[in-house]
Amino acid sequence: MANVTMRQMLEAGVHFGHQARYWNPKMAPYIFGKRNNIHIINLEETLPLYMEATNYLGRLAANKGTVLFVGTKRAAQEPVREEAGRCGMPYVNSRWLGGMLTNFQTVRRSIKRLHDLEAMIQDGSLDRLKKREALTVRRDRDKLENNLGGIKNMTHLPDALFVIDVEHERIAVDEAAKLGIPVVAVVDTNSDPRKADYIIPGNDDAIRAIRLYLRGIADGIIDGRTTAAAASASKASKDEFVEMEEASEEETLTESLSEKSASTDASVT
């Protein structure tokens, strides 16, 4: 489980919302007050919701679920790539292509094209093309890598989305809603919390805050997988012990019956 404290949230600026005039009234339960016309988010509300979201994604990962990280705004791009990569999850950090979820079959064809182009580059096939043709292939590969590189190993729709800024990523959030895919999201004071199934009320602009969310979520996913793997190994070991014990008992019984049979034969003789 992610070990994040309220002090760490304060230091990262999680409590700073948007200007009061841009607020969404639906966020009122999570707002502590105003300072210099900036809404201050109540971290006593944020911390438990953050832990709930982290635990949910950890349980999902423990059951071999896939979490798609989404953060295409400039401050989120690098942290999303780093933390999604660290916990082995797919991500979108450049641009959300319309239909990335709702038209996933078409996206998969583009992903296959990306893999084919990468194979051409790696096996030397590109060297047999004319210079202009080779340049076109590389440009196509680079474009596909930029748009789809984070999901090129995602073979099926994700089981959940983790989103930085529901307002900025509204297309992704809407697509997930249409498909019934749960959304875990950082929701600032200018956004509608009803768009996410698990909300984390907090600053969605500051890079330190974004890194804190992502690091904790990634840790939760890694912990979930580790715990599940340990439980699976323990069960396998226990099953093996039971099988050995049963085999030993069966062998003992067989020997006992053999001895009894031999004793009976001797008595008859």
UniProtKB/Swiss-Prot annotation:
SUPFAM superfamilies: Ribosomal protein S2 (SSF52313). GO terms for molecular function: structural constituent of ribosome. The keyword rRNA-binding does not apply. Keywords: Ribonucleoprotein, Ribosomal protein. GO terms for cellular component: cytosolic small ribosomal subunit. Residues 254-263 have a biased composition (Low complexity). InterPro entries: Ribosomal_uS2 (IPR001865), Ribosomal_uS2_bac/mit/plastid (IPR005706), Ribosomal_uS2_CS (IPR018130), Ribosomal_uS2_flav_dom_sf (IPR023591). Residues 232-269 are annotated as: Disordered. GO terms for biological process: translation. PROSITE patterns: RIBOSOMAL_S2_1 (PS00962), RIBOSOMAL_S2_2 (PS00963). The gene is rpsB. This is Small ribosomal subunit protein uS2. Residues 242-253 have a biased composition (Acidic residues). Belongs to the universal ribosomal protein uS2 family.
